[in-house]
Amino acid sequence: MAPVTPPVKPAPVFDTIYFDGNKTHINPIGAKSLDRNGLILKENPHLKVVIEGHTDSMGSDVVNQKISEKRAQNVKKYLQDKFNISDDRMMVKGYGRTRPIADNNTKEGRAKNRRVEFRIVP
């Protein structure tokens, strides 16, 4: 008889955190999403993530790069402060406006591009 393999637990799905234009602070809607992400990290202590910051295309490359990095850093700090997630489990990376997921020619598209995403790493 063949051995029974236990079911594989699917990888958790993290919420995307959205930001207001040209802002780096976490708004109340973003905080609710971050709280869900914090619980995922708390319940899965083996997980490590890269916190990836992004911007829309408004403004200069230099400014957008700084904004994307600051957004990612603020998300990391929030998770450290509120959920006591250790520093070695979270890396931050800013991509500026180089990785849009929507059309930057529309207000709606720009709003989708102002975000922080979580990527699980080994």
Task: State where each predicted segment sits.
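Periplasmic peptidoglycan-binding/tethering modules of Gram-negative envelope proteins
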Residues: 1-48, 81, 85-88, 122
